[in-house]
From Swiss-Prot:
HAMAP family to which the protein is assigned, alphabetical: Ribosomal_bL35
Cellular component terms per the entry's GO annotation: cytoplasm; cytosolic large ribosomal subunit
Name the UniProt record assigns to this protein: Large ribosomal subunit protein bL35
Gene source species: Escherichia coli (strain K12)
Keyword Ribonucleoprotein: yes
Subunit structure, interactors included: Part of the 50S ribosomal subunit.
UniProt keyword annotations, A-Z: Ribonucleoprotein, Ribosomal protein
A GO biological-process term: cytoplasmic translation
MF annotations from Gene Ontology: structural constituent of ribosome
Region (Disordered): 1-22
Pfam families, A to Z: Ribosomal_L35p
Family note: Belongs to the bacterial ribosomal protein bL35 family.
């Protein structure tokens, strides 16, 4: 059996946590920030966990994580 390839884009976007979940950076914090409220930008700053519905897709993309 050949090795399963890791999706490199996913490897750069997701980090595995100690309990087996995955964390990711929020979207909407790259450009056009002047019209966004400070509160909105502040809440987008911390990392978020991948939701249960998307977890299977992320695990499939990162077989060795």
């Amino acid at each position: 059996m050949p090795k399963i390839k890791t999706v490199r884009g996913a490897a750069k976007r997701f980090k595995k946590t100690g309990k087996g979940g995955f964390k990711h950076k929020h979207a909407n914090l790259r450009h056009i920030l002047t019209k966004k409220a400070t509160k909105r930008k502040r809440h987008l700053r911390p990392k978020a966990m991948v939701s249960k519905g998307d977890l299977g897709l992320v695990i499939a993309c990162l077989p060795y994580a």
